[in-house]
A protein has these predicted regions:
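Generic detection of well-ordered alpha-helical segments
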Residues: 25, 29, 63, 92, ...
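Basic, amphipathic "hinge/linker" alpha-helix immediately C-terminal to the N-terminal HTH DNA-binding motif
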Residues: 77-100
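Canonical helix-turn-helix DNA-binding module
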Residues: 47-73, 80
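Alpha-helical linker/hinge and terminal dimerization helices associated
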Residues: 29, 68, 97-109
């Protein structure tokens, strides 16, 4: 029965594939964890936390996370411009899943 299901499955339409599409990429999970830990973070603070990320890559990741409604971007009308990022309520619900992934990774990491 399971073999038949797998043979006929469209994994791109599953919740699993959808969730992976939201968090795929080198930096998205780290960005989400920074926002969970520090709650409200500005662009340059994220850049400092991530160290090796370029402005373009960080900007792209933030736009994608915002489009997926995992984070909230708040822009303040002042000079110089001030923009802050926080986890959305939807993003907060994802963090429990990511925590479990991290726990599994720590418990099952292969050592040489």
């Amino acid at each position: 029965m399971i073999k038949n299901y797998i043979e006929n499955a469209h994994f791109e339409d599953t919740g699993f594939a959808y969730t992976l599409s939201l968090i795929s990429g080198k930096h998205k999970m780290v960005i989400l964890y920074c926002l969970m830990e520090f709650e409200t973070v500005r662009f340059n603070e994220l850049k400092r936390y991530l160290k090796t990320i370029s402005d373009k890559t960080l900007s792209t990741n933030l736009k994608e996370l915002e489009a997926d409604k995992l984070i909230v971007r708040t822009e303040y009308p002042q000079i110089p411009p001030k923009v802050e990022y926080t986890l959305s309520e939807r993003g907060k619900t994802l963090m429990t899943v990511l925590d479990q992934l991290c726990v599994w990774g720590e418990e099952n990491r292969l050592t040489e």
